[in-house]
Amino acid sequence: MMARRDPTSWAKRLVRAQTLQKQRRAPVGPRAPPPDEEDPRLKCKNCGAFGHTARSTRCPMKCWKAALVPATLGKKEGKENLKPWKPRVEANPGPLNKDKGEKEERPRQQDPQRKALLHMFSGKPPEKPLPNGKGSTEPSDYLRVASGPMPVHTTSKRPRLDPVLADRSATEMSGRGSVLASLSPLRKASLSSSSSLGPKERQTGAAADMPQPAVRHQGREPLLVVKPTHSRPEGGCREVPQAASKTHGLLQAARPQAQDKRPAVTSQPCPPAATHSLGLGSNLSFGPGAKRPAQAPIQACLNFPKKPRLGPFQIPESAIQGGELGAPENLQPPPAATELGPSTSPQMGRRTPAQVPSVDRQPPHSRPCLPTAQACTMSHHPAASHDGAQPLRVLFRRLENGRWSSSLLAAPSFHSPEKPGAFLAQSPHVSEKSEAPCVRVPPSVLYEDLQVSSSSEDSDSDLE
């Protein structure tokens, strides 16, 4: 019976017995602790988790059975567009395609509205909006109302140029008004007459019988009331103080009107007439050049009916340039006579060359005025218009050593200095009083001395 046993079966039994013994034996390696026995202080170096070490079987890197394998979602062919898009035929569009077409047409229909708004901003008349329904017209109407003031703003820029010119003229008139506030009523009347002149007359400022460039220069002076600036004439004249130039500008504008009414009555030079006469270049003052004194002669000079004073415009050019030709209109003392103080130089009429050089002496002011041929007593000091001081006469006498001496003489006030007869009648009266203590000198010698002294003063003034 023993011979009948199969050796293969016996070998199988042996293997089974060995496996059972191995299972009964204790495990050789450390057993994995239960979940409640995990130590949170341990950290696995492989997976980075806490509670086990890298040698533990709980590590998913060691035991892949416990690891969670990411499950694949699978492949969906519907999500991927493998076939290219083919253009559809628009002959029979579906309902969805119709809605899309309407949405695309709406912005296209708003283009004419945008053009209309652009025309409104540019100031052009807007075009008629297309009949697109209530939704298309309402927004355009709202925008038109909101942008209404824009065309007014653009068109209002053009007429703003005229108000600027009006403002400048208003400032000039206000400046003249400020000057008129400090002037007398007679001087205001002269300025009102100057404003009535045309612009062409203001530029020329001369009548038909005023052919001299110096007279043309006088026409511009009324415009320079607030800040007067006098340019030098051809012959060269001196600067004028601002106080003298303001009043002179007011009177120059009124001069052409009175001259047109009545021509020159006398050839006796007056202060406003030869304002720019070059004569000997003497420092002769002009009557209206400074502030008016409170005297009757000054008021008569500013009075328009007094027309004999308007005759000096007919002075020939030889008399204006008499300094070079040897025919001086006025006589002037040498610089030694001006040592009394900064005052205007005296004047002598050319009608009285044989008399003793007794001339009107003006109250002192800052600087000498323009050379003029003045025949009446005038005050140029700014404060003299309010003081009412009596005019002074200065007597110049030539000494034996060639020098001059001056002395002040009280002179009676003139009542009508405009009339040449009155002045000539009173001038000898004063000269007779002063001729007693002085020595009579030939007029030719006096002319030569005065011409030399005036030329030296001109050179000094040019250097200044």
From Swiss-Prot:
Annotated region described as Disordered, given as residue ranges: 1-42, 70-389, 415-437
UniProt feature, compositional bias: Low complexity: 180-197
Feature: compositional bias, Basic and acidic residues: 74-89, 97-114
InterPro entries in alphabetical order: FAM90, Znf-CCHC_6
Pfam assignment, any one: zf-CCHC_6
Misc. comment: Primate-specific FAM90A gene family, thought to have arisen during multiple duplication and rearrangement events.
Family stated for the protein in its record: Belongs to the FAM90 family.
Protein's name according to its UniProt entry: Protein FAM90A15
Gene assigned in the entry: FAM90A15
